[in-house]
């Protein structure tokens, strides 16, 4: 908008135009009543001129200030018309505008003075009046086309160098726009006093256009700016070089508090590719994108956020399907290497499906204060990350998420300059993850809580998985292989590294790995340091580095008295082949408590080396495991190590060595080719319960003075009467000739008493003791008997008591004591499990303190009725139900509080009775209702 100096002739010419302008409409054509079309060839149009019913422009037309097409009028602009606009001039459309430009001969709207004009404005009165704009070019305007509640149809519109906005929509405008081109919005500005410069297409205040085909090039602020509850459908969009504003975020697409649909979109070389921001909570934001490509953005490819980052009531504000983001912060960007993230989601929710992030100089995807309203499905991140920038080194950076978990379903990350995933203080869920060929760890979880189902982590330079200070983590179906070959420390070389993962015992928040296979690591398969309450199940470690223990634990760094816990292992299969003359253990545990179930080891190794010293004196266990290796088993500093079902395999060529340990094993089986030698130092004791094929004759010379090996067995006592019926609650006393104290107990309801794990023999460095002799005495109702057994194996003792006829045993099932039933409701009476030691017939009497004999209240013959029983059946103990109103048999029980007494007698006259209290009462109704969505714990219904 250059201001040029004027010659005197020019000044007189302008004055002449001002004088003659009021008479411009007095053309002879204006007085021709038969001709409704006025042609202006050329014509100068000033402030006071209004269009008549129908006006046609052609040739060159000059608009010096404003021109208005009244509400019932139409302005037609012919092909090749050149409209010269004065400074600030604007054409107002309140009626109909028809532009008949062609591709070969478009209509042009240009500045005539060197100062920018205000273009065309459609007011709301023009809505539905059929305005059509074909092949129009607008140059050097402040605004190109402005709409207030209008809906023109536009084909092939080109807008060059608009200062503020190319197309500006307000008040629920709904135009149809086809083949739009806007270039250099905001690029030639004399000054800028606010942010609203350099916008290509602005859709606001509830507007809903259809845009099919648009090209935006070289804009200052935004190519597409959507705000104020607007929507519409925009497709086949291309934009490039949207950059440079210091007043507002520059972006190819900006969506604010709106709900548009954008299809087939390409954004190249912009400050930000796509920005979706929620600001006003009185409305909602939901932008939908399909088939979008964003390339060479300077800061972010896609940015989805909320203006108030402390408002955590997130919901899904953006939906992307088939999104590609390439080259963020790369050489193709306006300024390389200053990017924040290729995709950035901050304090809000979004849906991403089929997303590719490629070659970003910062992290590929960053989540900050997101939650379960964010989902990524089929996300691929390649060759991304910013070296030396913490979480931004990673392909995926997830930080500060603890409200609810975002979801990743199908995720592949490769070529990151740092970790594949860096998670810090974050909660999230994932499935079907493939993390490979990353420059550091495949996955680094720092103080995070995750649930991941199905992952492959391979060919990462450092560990496949590094978990630091993790809590409440469940990993399922993991395959971790060929990791750590770029590492220099044992921690970096491990396949999976648990690093201070939950350092204190807690009934919840455990760290778990279920069905995890770790192979071909540069170091250990699983490396654990200072971690407690781990749960490892169905673990396979194979072909990891032979110079490292495949399973390696060291908890020596935990704080005494404050930290510690137990590592839980259920199913650990190890195959390894050592190298060199010195053996490497398959399992190496140092200063840690553990519960190990189902451990198997194969290959060439030295077995198990386990130092059980731990900071809080936790006990340990190893059960159902196979011992093998050249060293077999070495146990040190175990205060209490238990177990059962362990087997010494034929491949065990070493010893079972105990140093300063107390070990109690049941059912240890020795299948070694030669009897396995047990070695105990003077501070150790071994208790073997029911050992199988364990020959201690080979071991006692290696038992140090003061150490013991006890061999123990079980005793089962069955106390019966003359009818071979087990006697419940019979007294059993057992005394032992050595080692064990006297004990006393009662039999169970079937007359059995199990007495497990009593020492039958003790071995020391001098050999074995004699076998222990046990004396068993049983008694009931002043009748007793006794016998003796030698505890050299499991023993079963049948103790017979010749009793007199005994009272029956009353076993009352229903109704339970203090039961409450509805008024006149059914009540079942069942004591059919009652029985008699002498196999006598039993008689049952049911009595209520209110109604008397309950069975006597039953009326009817008991034939063909629903219960199919008689009063005699009830007396014999058959269960029955009152208040059922069967046609042929009715038993009644009135409302009120009843004391029910049951007496059971045998035919010898021995009786036993019991009383219970029940109540039949007319109760208030119970209201049960379901609410969707579910209410909060405070019974609040929150509707999003």
How would you name each of these model-derived features?
Residues 817-825, 933-943:
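Short, solvent-exposed loop/linker segments at the N-terminal edge
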Residues 805-809, 842, 925-926:
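Proline-centered linker/hinge motifs at extracellular inter-domain junctions
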Residues 830-838, 944:
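Acidic, Ser/Thr
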Residues 25-448, 453-531, 535-624, 628-635, ...:
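Beta-strand/loop edge motif enriched in small/polar residues
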Residues 726, 736-766, 787:
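Short, acidic Ser/Thr/Gly-rich low-complexity loop/linker segments typical of extracellular
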Residues 672, 691-695, 761-788:
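A short, solvent-exposed loop/turn motif at the edges and junctions
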Residues 786-806:
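Extracellular beta-sheet/turn segments enriched in Thr/Pro/Gly and aliphatic residues
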């Amino acid at each position: 908008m250059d201001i040029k100096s004027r010659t005197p002739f020019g000044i007189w010419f302008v004055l002449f135009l001002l004088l003659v302008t009021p008479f411009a409409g007095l053309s002879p054509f204006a007085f021709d009543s038969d001709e409704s079309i006025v042609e202006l060839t050329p014509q100068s149009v000033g402030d006071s001129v209004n269009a008549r019913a129908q006006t046609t422009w052609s040739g060159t037309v000059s608009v010096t200030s404003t021109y208005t097409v009244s509400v019932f009028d139409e302005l037609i602009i012919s092909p090749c018309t050149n409209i010269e606009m004065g400074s600030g001039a604007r054409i107002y459309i309140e009626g109909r505008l028809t532009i008949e430009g062609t591709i070969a001969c478009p209509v042009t709207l240009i500045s005539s003075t060197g100062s920018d004009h205000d273009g065309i404005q459609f007011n709301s009165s023009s809505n539905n009046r059929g305005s059509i704009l074909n092949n129009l070019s607008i140059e050097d305007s402040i605004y190109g086309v402005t709409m207030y509640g209008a809906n023109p149809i536009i084909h092939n519109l080109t807008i060059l160098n608009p200062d503020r906005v190319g197309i500006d929509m307000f008040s629920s405008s709904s135009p149809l726009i086809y083949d739009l081109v806007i270039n250099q919005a905001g690029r030639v500005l004399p000054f800028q006093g606010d942010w609203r410069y350099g916008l290509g297409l602005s859709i606001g205040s509830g507007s809903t256009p259809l845009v099919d085909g648009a090209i935006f090039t070289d804009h200052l602020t935004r190519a597409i700016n959507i705000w104020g509850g607007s929507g519409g459908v925009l497709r086949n969009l291309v934009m490039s070089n949207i950059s440079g504003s210091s007043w507002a975020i520059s972006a190819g697409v900006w969506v604010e508090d709106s709900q548009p649909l954008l299809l087939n979109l390409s954004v190249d070389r912009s400050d930000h590719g796509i920005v979706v921001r929620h600001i006003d909570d009185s409305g909602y934001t939901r932008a939908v994108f399909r088939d979008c490509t964003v390339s060479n953005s300077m800061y972010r490819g896609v940015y989805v956020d909320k203006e108030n980052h402390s408002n955590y009531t997130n919901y899904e504000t953006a939906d992307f399907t088939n999104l590609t983001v390439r080259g963020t912060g790369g050489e193709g960007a306006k300024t390389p290497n200053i990017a924040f993230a290729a995709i950035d989601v901050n304090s809000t929710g979004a849906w991403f499906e089929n997303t590719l992030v490629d070659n970003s100089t910062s992290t590929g995807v960053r989540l900050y204060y997101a939650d379960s309203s964010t989902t990524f499905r089929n996300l691929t991140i390649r060759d991304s990350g910013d070296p030396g920038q913490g979480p931004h080194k990673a392909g995926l950076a997830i930080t500060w998420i603890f409200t609810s978990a975002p979801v990743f379903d199908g995720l592949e990350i490769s070529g990151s300059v740092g970790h594949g995933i860096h998670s810090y203080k974050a909660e999230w869920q994932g499935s079907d993850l493939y993390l490979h060929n990353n420059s550091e760890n495949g996955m680094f979880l720092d103080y995070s809580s995750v649930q991941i189902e199905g992952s492959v982590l391979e060919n990462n330079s450092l560990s496949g998985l590094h978990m630091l200070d993790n809590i409440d983590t469940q990993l399922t179906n993991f395959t971790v292989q060929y990791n750590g070959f770029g590492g220099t420390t044992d921690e970096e070389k491990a396949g999976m590294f648990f690093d201070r993962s939950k350092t204190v015992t807690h009934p919840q928040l455990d760290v778990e790995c279920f069905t995890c296979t770790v192979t071909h690591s540069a170091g250990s398969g699983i490396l654990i340091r200072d971690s407690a309450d781990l749960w490892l199940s169905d673990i396979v470690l194979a072909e990891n580095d032979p110079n490292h223990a495949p399973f390696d634990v060291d908890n020596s760094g935990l704080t005494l008295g404050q930290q510690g816990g137990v590592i839980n292992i259920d199913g650990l299969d190890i195959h390894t082949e050592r190298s060199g003359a010195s053996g490497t253990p398959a399992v190496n545990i140092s200063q840690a408590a553990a519960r190990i179930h189902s451990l198997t080891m194969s290959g060439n190794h030295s077995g198990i080396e386990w130092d059980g010293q731990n900071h809080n004196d936790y006990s340990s266990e190893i059960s159902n495991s196979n011992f093998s290796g050249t060293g077999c088993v070495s146990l040190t500093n175990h205060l209490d190590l238990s177990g059962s079902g362990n087997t010494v395999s034929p491949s065990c060529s070493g010893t079972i060595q105990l140093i300063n340990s107390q070990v109690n094993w049941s059912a240890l089986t020795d299948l070694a080719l030669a009897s396995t030698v047990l070695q105990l130092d003077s501070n150790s004791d071994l208790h073997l319960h029911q050992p199988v094929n364990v020959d201690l004759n080979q071991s006692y010379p290696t038992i140090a003075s003061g150490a013991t090996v006890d061999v123990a067995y079980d005793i089962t006592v069955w106390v019966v009467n003359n009818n071979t019926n087990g006697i419940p609650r019979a007294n059993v006393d057992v005394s032992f000739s050595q080692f064990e104290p006297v004990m006393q107990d009662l039999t169970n309801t079937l007359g059995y008493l199990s007495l497990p794990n009593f020492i039958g023999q003790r071995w020391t460095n001098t050999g074995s003791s004699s076998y222990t002799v046990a004396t068993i005495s049983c008694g009931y109702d002043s009748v007793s008997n006794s016998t003796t057994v030698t505890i050299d194996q499991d023993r079963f003792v049948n103790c017979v008591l010749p009793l007199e006829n005994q009272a029956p045993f009353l076993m009352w099932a229903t109704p339970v004591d203090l039961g409450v039933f509805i008024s006149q409701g059914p009540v079942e009476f069942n004591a059919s499990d009652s029985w008699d030691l002498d196999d006598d017939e039993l008689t049952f009497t049911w009595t209520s303190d209110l109604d008397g004999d309950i069975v006597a209240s039953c009326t009817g013959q008991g034939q063909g009725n629903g219960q199919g029983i008689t009063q005699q059946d009830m007396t014999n103990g058959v269960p029955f139900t009152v208040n059922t109103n069967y046609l042929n048999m009715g038993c009644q029980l009135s409302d009120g509080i009843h004391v029910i007494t049951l007496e059971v007698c045998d035919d010898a006259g021995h009786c036993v009775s019991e009383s219970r209290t029940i109540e039949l009462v007319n109760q208030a109704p119970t209201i049960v209702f379901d609410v969707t969505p579910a209410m909060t714990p405070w019974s609040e219904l929150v509707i999003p």
